Each structure stands twice: as structure tokens, then as C-alpha cells.
Amino acid sequence: MGVLVKKLIDDLNLEVLVEGKEDVEISVNDINRPGLQLAGFYNYFAPERIQVIGKAEWSFLDYMQIELRKKRVKKYFSFDINCLIITRGLEPHPEFIKEAKKHNIWFVRSNLVTTQFISKTTIYLADKLAPETRLHGVLVDVSGIGILITGESGIGKSETALELIKRGHRLVTDDAVDIKDIDGQLIGRSPKITVGMLEVRGLGIIDVTTLYGLSSVVQEKEIRLVMHFEHWKDDNDYDRLGIDNEYMNILGINVKKLTVPIRPGRNIAVIIEAAAVNYRHALMSKITPVDVIENRMNELND
């Protein structure tokens, strides 16, 4: 699914010089500056990219003889271009207006410096075109680590999130987690309709922002750890040493997963806090608690 050029124009507040087709989409987040094409070189030209004319391209065209410029611009517009953008608020050469109208191609203008515009647009497209999915769960920011809590309905995910919020951590989203793969990072967000809301059985929906302040909710967070809740089963052999590596695959990316057995009396919020701190420690140190115990045992045996 691409991004409609019209939506890009609205979102980036661009000035329309020539309107194109309503249904034209952008399907790649790369950007092309057509200096080589305007010089007559079309090998490896990618017309499916957004085309951006900056000060350098504009100056090159300005020094060009009018007849040659008409010829080059006509050739350039013979390709299936989805969108052409001129930056710095520059006044376009009349040949561009004429050919854009002739071929019904979007031609718009930005007042930003070219490098700033390209950077802003690349980030925008990377977000809009990123692979995405929606999972059932709760996403919280615990000590700076994004933790996705999963498990069957009614097992206590939202109640645990509420306890974590009370302890100074932050909610990203409850019940539905929208996840995008942006440059290899899984970024989780809340659907717009439920931002800042938390559903607690027996209490109903509460507005976390109103009750606990603006700092209790964060707009998005990279998912670094998955904690899966399941009812305690006596016959299950749960990991007690932290040496079993289990992962959850989300959009083709493996995320470390911990299974937390739930039963009355266990303080799950404290366990999640410990998991977050332990995860951060593991990123900074190659020595695990198991290694420490083994070293102590070896010292005692010597």
C-alpha cells in the first residue's frame, strides 16, 4: 500500500502548482534529484521515486539555452513520474508548468531548503510505507525498555500495566498494538481512538493521561522485549535459570520473549521491572548471573 501524492502534499503542507491524477501513489521512500536526467543521461533513472529540483538543478536549467531546455524537459516528462517538487520557494521555469499540465503530473513547491526537505520527506515516507501489523496486547515503557505484554484476555495484562503506571512507568497502548518495522526497529503505537486509555475489568475505561498526568503516556516505543502471560501449570517446566532463549517473530524480526506464569500472590509488576533492568544489564555486560554462579562454584572446588 502506497501513499497518495495528495496526502503527502497535505501532510507536508506543500503548495500545488499543477494538479495531477487523484489516485497517484508513492510506493518507495527513495528520492531522486534529476540533475543527470536534465543533462540527458537516463541510464538507471528511477521515475517511480519522488523527483526533487533544488537550487543546483534550477541553476543548471537557468543557464541552459531555451530551446535545449525545452527539449530536455520534454524528454524528462515522457517518463511516468508520480510527483515533482521544487524547493526553496523557487520560481519554476515555464517549460515545467507546461509539461506537467500536458501529462497531468503533480508539480508542487516547498519553501524548505532542499536538504531539509529531503530529510523530512524521507522520514515521513519511511514511516508511512513501513510494513505493519496489529497485535493484541499491552505495550509499556519500563525503565526505558519497550515491553510488549501478551496473553489471553482477562489474564491481567491491563491491571499489570496500571500497577506499572502507578510505579512511574509509562503506557504506550492497551488492548491493540499497532507495530511498524522502521529500518529494522519494531515501533509500537496506539490506535488513535484509544490513545491514553486503559481498560480494567470491573472498573471500565480510564483516562491515564487525566488521572496520572501527561508523563504517564508515551506516543510510541521500540519493542525490545515480549512478556507472555499464561496461567500457572504445575506440570510445566518453566525456565528458572534464565538460560532458555525464546523469541517471538514480529514482521520477520525476532524479539526476545519471556513466559511469565500467573498465579495468585505473584507481584507481576515487580517481575516486569526486574526483567527490564535485567535486559538493559544484558545489553551492557556479557557476564550473566549463571556465569557468576559457575565462577563461584569453580572457586569453591579449587
Curated annotation (Swiss-Prot):
Record InterPro entries: HPr(Ser)_kin/Pase, Hpr_kin/Pase_C, Hpr_kin/Pase_Hpr_N, P-loop_NTPase, Ser_kin/Pase_Hpr-like_N_sf
Binding positions for ATP per the UniProt entry: 151-158
GO terms, biological process: regulation of carbohydrate metabolic process
Matches recorded under SUPFAM superfamilies: HprK N-terminal domain-like, PEP carboxykinase-like
Source organism phylogeny: Bacteria, Bacillati, Bacillota, Clostridia, Eubacteriales
Claim: Magnesium is one of the keywords in the record: yes
Residues forming the catalytic site: 136, 157, 175, 240
Record keywords: ATP-binding, Carbohydrate metabolism, Kinase, Magnesium, Metal-binding, Multifunctional enzyme, Nucleotide-binding, Serine/threonine-protein kinase, Transferase
GO molecular function, one term: protein serine/threonine/tyrosine kinase activity
Lineage: superkingdom: Bacteria
Annotated catalysed reactions: [HPr protein]-L-serine + ATP = [HPr protein]-O-phospho-L-serine + ADP + H(+); [HPr protein]-O-phospho-L-serine + phosphate + H(+) = [HPr protein]-L-serine + diphosphate
Role, per record: Catalyzes the ATP- as well as the pyrophosphate-dependent phosphorylation of a specific serine residue in HPr, a phosphocarrier protein of the phosphoenolpyruvate-dependent sugar phosphotransferase system (PTS). HprK/P also catalyzes the pyrophosphate-producing, inorganic phosphate-dependent dephosphorylation (phosphorolysis) of seryl-phosphorylated HPr (P-Ser-HPr).
Cofactor: Mg(2+)
Family: Belongs to the HPrK/P family.
Chain positions covered by the region annotation Important for the catalytic mechanism of both phosphorylation and dephosphorylation: 198-207
Protein name: HPr kinase/phosphorylase
Keyword ATP-binding on entry: yes
